[in-house]
A protein has these predicted regions:
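Primarily marks secretory-pathway-exposed extracellular/lumenal segments that are disulfide-
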Residues: 22-143, 313-319
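Activation on beta-sandwich/Ig-like modules and their edge loops
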Residues: 37-40, 48, 69, 142-281
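Short, surface-exposed secondary-structure junctions/capping segments
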Residues: 93-96, 134-142, 213, 268-290, ...
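Extracellular low-complexity, O-glycosylation-prone Ser/Thr/Pro/Gly-rich "stalks"
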Residues: 281-319
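Bacterial Sec-dependent N-terminal signal peptides
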Residues: 1-32, 36-37
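Short, well-ordered strand-loop elements centered on a beta-strand within folded domains, enriched
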Residues: 99-101, 120-125, 248-260, 290-306
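A short secondary-structure junction signal
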Residues: 113, 224-226, 294-296
């Protein structure tokens, strides 16, 4: 069960705003749209981010260029594309202000660019229908690298939640808590039991290690790897979230969640195309996941095996 996940960050950037058939199109066709993801919780560290530039016609930016500034200082000057795409890297700290300045060329409608974070996730874009100004202003926000790596809803009391520390350093878990709802949430978007499970100051999880919260009467194979007990874990239809400590019913920060904060789903929520995946199954986070879902359970659960962050195992499979 204690998998000691070895998460490797692979820059498999989803350059979804330039499909293959967008190259060599008519010069009057606008660049495709980009959906900008929501910023997420900060952590203290420096990261390398990416400026990714495209030309939908494939003949370069024809005199256009972009400058990128961090906290008012130009760090990338006169960046341009000579073919269909270009990639450059720059460093940011949490809270840095990132701005771009655009210089027009002959065919701006061919041009678009996006800023990706350290994990290949699109943070902002320009030169699209959503942002036709060709300029970006955003504040660098880093994900919290702590998340649920396993969840088990087994027979009888064989239940646990496993929390993984992917920060690269020792983590004091007292900064976090588990907040939950029972049989759906009484009020949509509000926790029935905020700060339901808390952690004593000095509860240290080593880098790359996990912390297991389990039912006190769970199987010996679970308790042998356990760190803390909790009587009321999920029966399949009870949402559990990793939150920042100090959560209240309607004021909280979700780092990761299993289940959603709406009505009772019935037996459980579907996961990876498996009906009632949170009921009578073990869920294991894929090794490609490096941070929590920030409360977006639907995207995390997915509707297909490939489109989910989770691997669904049979009940009582926690080997």
């Amino acid at each position: 069960m204690r998998k000691m996940l070895s998460v490797m960050v692979v820059f498999a950037l989803a350059f979804n705003f330039l499909a293959a058939d967008n190259v060599r199109k008519n010069k009057t066709e606008p660049a495709p749209s980009i959906t900008t993801p929501q910023n997420i919780e900060n952590n203290s560290r420096t990261e390398d981010w990416i400026l990714y530039m495209i030309d939908s016609y494939g003949d370069g930016w024809n005199g256009a260029s972009v400058d990128l500034l961090v906290n008012g200082t130009v760090v990338l000057d006169d960046q341009t594309v000579t073919g269909s795409e270009g990639t450059v890297y720059f460093s940011v700290d949490e809270g840095d202000i990132i701005e771009t300045v655009w210089t027009s060329g002959s065919y701006d409608n061919e041009c678009a660019y996006g800023i990706y974070n350290h994990y290949g996730e699109l943070q902002a874009s320009a030169g699209t229908e959503d942002n036709p100004t060709y300029e970006i202003y955003l504040i660098a926000s880093f994900p919290v690298l702590v998340f649920f790596s396993e969840y088990a809803e087994g027979t009888s009391n064989n239940k646990y939640l496993e929390i993984y520390n992917n920060t690269g350093a020792d983590l004091d878990l007292s900064a976090y808590s588990l907040s939950s709802c029972s049989n759906g949430c009484d009020e949509t978007g509000e926790f029935d039991y905020p700060d339901n499970v808390t952690f004593d100051a000095g509860t240290i999880v080593a880098a790359g290690d996990v912390y297991v919260v389990h039912h006190p009467d769970a199987d010996a194979a679970i308790t042998a790897e356990g760190d803390q007990t909790h009587q009321y874990l999920s029966n399949g239809d009870d949402a559990y979230a990793l939150t920042l400590a100090g959560a209240t019913a309607d004021a909280y920060t979700i780092v990761d969640i299993i289940g959603d904060m709406g009505d009772d789903p019935g037996a459980g929520w579907p996961v990876a195309g498996v009906d009632d995946g949170t009921k009578e199954h073990t869920l294991v986070r894929k090794g490609s996941v490096v941070h929590g879902n920030d409360g977006d359970w639907a995207s995390s659960a997915g509707v297909t095996e490939d489109g989910s962050e989770w691997i669904v195992l049979e009940q009582n499979d926690w080997t």
